[in-house]
Amino acid sequence: MKLLVMSDSHGYTEKMRTIINDNRDAECIIFLGDGEHDWDDCMADIPGMNARRQIAVCGNCDPCSFLPVTSFDNIGDHKFYITHGFRQNVKITLDSIYMDALKNERDVVLFGHTHRPFYEEYNGVHLFNPGAVMNGRYGVINIDADGDLSFEHYELA
């Protein structure tokens, strides 16, 4: 199963649209906030979006959002903790978001906010930031038939 992960578009709707169109084989699309209007525009404009699972949370630059700040989702055999990361101060430390994952028995944490691609596996918890769509960056997570995860960062040409 292919998961497309994006964050921090900040008005760069066309970059988001390109990323989504380049990854039409993704079964699930996840948006980590800071660009809710970009997300809404793409979800409305791109044919076939309703056929895919969609998960979105708000970021600190999404005022008056109706999106949740955090989402706990099971995808395959994995338990995902999905958030923008601003409330966990991820620009300073990942300790808080890691402890939240442990407390909520999550094995995958997806966050944005820093605009920097990041991946680390620590004591069985995968921490993944796709980077910022505004900089042409996004991530892909693949879950194979055995449930094994792979995490990749990409950048638009």
Where does each model-flagged region fall?
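Helix-adjacent hinge/juxtasegments
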Residues: 51-90
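Active-site neighborhood of phospho(di)ester-bond hydrolases with catalytic His/Asp-centered motifs
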Residues: 5-7, 29-34, 55-60, 81-84, ...
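Core dinuclear metal-dependent hydrolase active-site scaffold
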Residues: 3-5, 74, 80-82, 138-141, ...
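Active-site environment of divalent metal-dependent phosphoester hydrolases
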Residues: 10-14, 36-40, 61-66, 88-93, ...
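Binuclear metal-dependent phosphoesterase catalytic core
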Residues: 99, 103-105, 121-157
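Short secondary-structure boundary/capping segments
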Residues: 46, 70-74, 101, 117-119
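Charged helix-capping and loop-helix junction motifs
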Residues: 92-100
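N-terminal active-site segment of His-dependent metallophosphoesterases
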Residues: 1-49, 62-66, 146-148, 154
